[in-house]
């Protein structure tokens, strides 16, 4: 019998959550991570499935995700503990045939449940599936320190925030040419913040929750982690620059245009126009 804890997706979640903890992005039970799987991914581990999988209804139906398996982090779970006990802190779930709820197939032991941000994740998965023709499979939420700090001092506007991050590090325009969406402050763990995040995910692979954290989407765990890491590195540079009196020189609009042409990406027009 194959052990699901040795699967690529459980091992990938262990690495991503451990790396995020070591970065300081996920204190206590902060942050959540979901990865969309295929039936073929979980098929070799049918002997690991709970004898009587628990069923949990969704707060709103999501037919686009019908019959889709995911691996998710648990509610109230600490990222730092995932590596110690994957089955207690992670779960494999599968949405039912009409998208009205899901069964917990593996993990989330002792009656644990998926992250409270699951509605936001699932709504964002729906939008990224449509926006990327199914390429994006990961939604990651974390409390990236410097990105949060910038939401207190920069205008919380997509164009302004995006342009500052592009100028903070040359690679940023190449990594997220679609810019960074920004919400107003909202209560977390609600359908409302999930819907607002998903709306921004139609246009952006990164979405900031001011004074709280960031949502990122990507095709793999590495790509998604790297996306957030790149934006956070630029934010760290900007925090240092602002603390030293601000920019005396920076990357110009013309240089940003040249950068986009060189790497074959189309920069967000509103950010480029500033």
From Swiss-Prot:
Instruction: Name any Gene Ontology BP term.
Output: rhamnose catabolic process
Q: What is the lineage of its organism?
A: Bacteria, Pseudomonadati, Pseudomonadota, Gammaproteobacteria, Enterobacterales
From the Swiss-Prot or TrEMBL record, give the protein name.
Rhamnulose-1-phosphate aldolase
Could you say which residues bind Zn(2+) here?
141, 143, 212
Citing just one GO molecular function, the answer is: metal ion binding
Q: Which UniProt keywords apply?
A: Cytoplasm, Lyase, Metal-binding, Rhamnose metabolism, Zinc
Pfam families associated with the record: Aldolase_II
UniProt subcellular location: Cytoplasm
Q: What is its EC number?
A: 4.1.2.19
Subunit structure, interactors included: Homotetramer.
- Cofactor: binding details: Binds 1 zinc ion per subunit.
Keyword flag Endoplasmic reticulum:
no
Which InterPro entries is this protein grouped with? Aldolase_class_II_sugar_metab, Aldolase_II/adducin_N, Aldolase_II/adducin_N_sf, Rhamnulose-1-P_Aldolase
Q: Does the keyword Lyase apply?
A: yes
What is one GO cellular-component annotation here? cytosol
Signal peptide bounds: none
Q: Which cofactor does it need?
A: Zn(2+)
Q: What does this protein do?
A: Catalyzes the reversible cleavage of L-rhamnulose-1-phosphate to dihydroxyacetone phosphate (DHAP) and L-lactaldehyde.
Pathway(s) of this molecule = Carbohydrate degradation; L-rhamnose degradation; glycerone phosphate from L-rhamnose: step 3/3
| Active site residues of this protein | 117
By its UniProt entry, which CDD domains does this protein fall under? Answer: Aldolase_II
Q: Which domain of life is it from?
A: Bacteria
State the reactions this protein catalyses.
Answer: L-rhamnulose 1-phosphate = (S)-lactaldehyde + dihydroxyacetone phosphate
Protein family according to the UniProt entry = Belongs to the aldolase class II family. RhaD subfamily.
């Amino acid at each position: 019998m194959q052990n699901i804890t040795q699967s690529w997706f459980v091992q990938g979640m262990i690495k991503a959550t451990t790396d995020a903890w070591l970065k300081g992005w996920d204190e206590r039970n902060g942050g959540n991570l979901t990865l969309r799987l295929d039936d073929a991914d979980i098929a070799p581990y049918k002997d690991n499935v709970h004898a009587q999988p628990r069923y949990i209804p969704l707060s709103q139906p999501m037919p686009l995700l019908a019959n889709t398996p995911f691996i998710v982090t648990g509610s109230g779970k600490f990222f730092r503990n995932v590596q110690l006990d994957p089955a207690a802190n992670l779960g494999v779930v599968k949405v039912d045939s009409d998208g009205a709820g899901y069964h917990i197939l593996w993990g989330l032991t002792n009656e644990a449940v998926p992250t409270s941000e699951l509605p936001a994740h699932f709504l964002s998965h729906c939008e990224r599936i449509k926006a990327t023709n199914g390429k994006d499979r990961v939604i990651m939420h974390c409390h990236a320190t410097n990105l949060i700090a910038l939401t207190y001092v920069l205008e919380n506007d997509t164009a302004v925030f995006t342009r500052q991050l592009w100028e903070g590090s040359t690679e940023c325009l190449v990594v997220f040419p679609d810019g960074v969406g920004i919400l107003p402050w909202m209560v977390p763990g609600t359908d409302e913040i999930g819907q607002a995040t998903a709306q921004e995910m139609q246009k952006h692979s990164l979405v900031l929750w001011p004074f709280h954290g960031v949502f990122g989407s990507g095709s793999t765990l590495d790509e998604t982690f790297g996306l957030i890491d790149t934006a956070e590195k630029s934010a760290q540079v900007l925090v240092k620059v602002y603390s030293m009196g601000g920019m005396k020189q920076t990357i110009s609009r013309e240089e940003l245009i040249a950068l986009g042409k060189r790497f074959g990406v189309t920069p967000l027009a509103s950010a480029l126009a500033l």
